[in-house]
């Protein structure tokens, strides 16, 4: 089953991206290096649940 998750910047705390994840295949939390527009640099973004 696919669930919608947000990607939250670890440095500034903003949720900059949203994506879908297959919770059956990917059981651990996503952690990706993405661009943060507030800091204007690439930072690590961790998965957070979005309100549906």
UniProtKB/Swiss-Prot annotation:
Keywords: Ribonucleoprotein, Ribosomal protein. One of its GO terms (cellular component) is ribosome. GO terms for biological process: translation. It comes from the Bacteria. Transmembrane segments: none annotated. PROSITE patterns: RIBOSOMAL_L33. GO terms for molecular function: structural constituent of ribosome. Gene3D superfamilies: Ribosomal protein L33. The keyword Cytoplasm does not apply. The keyword Kinase does not apply. NCBIfam families: PRK00504.1, PRK00595.1, rpmG_bact. Belongs to the bacterial ribosomal protein bL33 family. This is Large ribosomal subunit protein bL33. It comes from Campylobacter jejuni subsp. doylei (strain ATCC BAA-1458 / RM4099 / 269.97). The gene is rpmG.
């Amino acid at each position: 089953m696919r669930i919608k998750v947000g990607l939250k910047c670890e440095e500034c705390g903003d949720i900059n991206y949203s994506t879908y994840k297959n919770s059956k295949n990917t059981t651990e939390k996503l952690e990706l290096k993405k661009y943060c527009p507030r800091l204007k640099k690439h930072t690590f973004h961790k998965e957070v649940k979005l309100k549906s």
